[in-house]
């Protein structure tokens, strides 16, 4: 339902920001 979709979008956003943080730390460009 709608709640599940919101949850999925939220999880995607969190995962994306974690990936961005991890990759910027790895490349040393934070």
Swiss-Prot record:
GO terms classed as biological process: defense response to bacterium; killing of cells of another organism
One family name in Pfam for this protein: Antimicrobial_2
Annotated Gene Ontology cellular component terms: extracellular region
Disulfide bond annotation, renumbered to this chain: 24-30
Location within or outside the cell: Secreted
Keyword Transferase: no
This protein's record includes keyword Secreted: yes
InterPro entries, per the entry: Antimicrobial_frog_2 (IPR012521)
Key words of the record: Amphibian defense peptide, Antibiotic, Antimicrobial, Cytolysis, Disulfide bond, Hemolysis, Secreted
Top-level taxon of the source organism: Eukaryota
Principal place of residence: secreted
Tissues of expression: Expressed by the skin glands.
Chain segments annotated as coiled-coil in the UniProt record: none
Function of the protein: Shows antibacterial activity against representative Gram-negative and Gram-positive bacterial species, and hemolytic activity.
Family: Belongs to the frog skin active peptide (FSAP) family. Brevinin subfamily.
Protein name, UniProt field: Brevinin-2Ej
């Amino acid at each position: 339902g709608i709640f599940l979709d919101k949850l999925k979008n939220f999880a995607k956003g969190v995962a994306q920001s974690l990936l961005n943080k991890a990759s910027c730390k790895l490349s040393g460009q934070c």
